[in-house]
């Protein structure tokens, strides 16, 4: 009965969050916005970023599923609560499937926030889509490799009623960092960055940023409340996701491209009262 009540409350919260997201999206669509073409694609840039994301994510997948570089033997004596930092101990919880489900839902909503860019001209959809694909690929690759290299049991493993299936599939020691939080913050940062660059004069940019990051923060909170992650797992996931979510769009702006443009060489000559001056810029 207690689990059922938790599930009902979690489902109600999920519905409210969804309604809130739809409401701010509806208001956004009804407001005429002045659009700036802030981003563009470049063959070299896309080759590097898509290639990096594909290599990171692909190699991590191969090493995890086929090479088995991470050992998953569980020994209770290796994992003692007293060895955990005090800050992480404060947020430790046993496993909760209802909260796990809700956390996955908030992550999905945060990742779906770039859908608001449907208000932009259709000619920009490819640019936005490619940038977002690069964001998710790179964030996923960094997250997956960190999980492979860092051995950390999830908080629920320190409680007696830990889920047996998690132990069997090897997911129990992949706590660091939080993948859900990484994706949620990547989506939130990407949406915020792109919206603020494309609609700098819009009053909705604060609402977009608040709703997007609010959903990401809730994702991290639910990942801790469900017993899946420690506070530091969520914190690092938020940093990774935010960094990639801001960096990838920035590397498609005119300011970024301008740093690599060759300035034209110029020469000038002038006659002055004191002599003859020649200048050469390169």
Where are these regions (language model features)?
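Structural signal for the C-terminal ends of transmembrane alpha-helices
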Residues: 118-122, 194-197
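Interfacial helix-start motif at the membrane-water boundary
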Residues: 85-112
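Hydrophobic core of alpha-helical transmembrane segments in multi-pass integral membrane proteins
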Residues: 53-61, 109-116
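Short membrane-interface loop/juxtamembrane segments of multi-pass integral membrane proteins
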Residues: 82-93, 163-169
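Hydrophobic alpha-helical transmembrane segments of multi-pass membrane proteins
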Residues: 98-102, 129, 133, 178
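Interfacial/capping segments of alpha-helical transmembrane domains
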Residues: 65-81
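Solvent-exposed, amphipathic alpha-helical segments
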Residues: 111, 115-118, 216, 220
């Amino acid at each position: 009965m207690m689990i059922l009540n938790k599930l009902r409350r979690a489902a109600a919260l999920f519905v409210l969050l969804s309604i809130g997201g739809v409401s701010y999206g509806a208001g956004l669509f009804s407001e005429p916005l002045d659009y700036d073409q802030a981003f563009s694609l470049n063959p070299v840039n896309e080759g590097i970023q898509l290639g990096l994301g594909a290599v990171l994510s692909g190699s991590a997948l191969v090493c995890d599923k086929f090479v088995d570089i991470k050992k998953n033997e569980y020994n209770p004596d290796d994992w003692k609560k007293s060895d955990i930092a005090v800050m992480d101990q404060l947020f430790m919880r046993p496993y909760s499937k209802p909260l796990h489900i809700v956390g996955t839902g908030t992550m999905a909503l945060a990742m779906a926030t770039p859908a608001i860019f449907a208000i932009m001209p259709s000619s920009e959809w490819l640019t936005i889509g490619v940038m977002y694909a690069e964001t998710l690929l790179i964030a996923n690759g960094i997250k997956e490799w960190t999980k492979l290299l860092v051995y950390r049991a999830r908080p629920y493993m320190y409680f007696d009623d830990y889920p047996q299936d998690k132990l069997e599939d090897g997911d129990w020691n992949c706590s660091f960092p939080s993948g859900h939080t990484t994706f949620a913050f990547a989506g939130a940062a990407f949406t915020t960055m792109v919206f603020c660059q494309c609609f700098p004069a819009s009053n909705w940019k604060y609402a977009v940023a608040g709703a997007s990051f609010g959903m990401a923060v809730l994702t991290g909170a639910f990942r801790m409340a469900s017993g899946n992650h420690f506070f530091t797992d969520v914190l690092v996931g938020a940093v990774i996701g935010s960094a990639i979510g801001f960096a990838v769009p920035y590397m498609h702006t005119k300011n970024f491209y301008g740093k690599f443009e060759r300035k034209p060489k110029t020469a000038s000559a002038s006659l002055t009262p004191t002599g003859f001056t020649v200048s050469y810029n390169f």
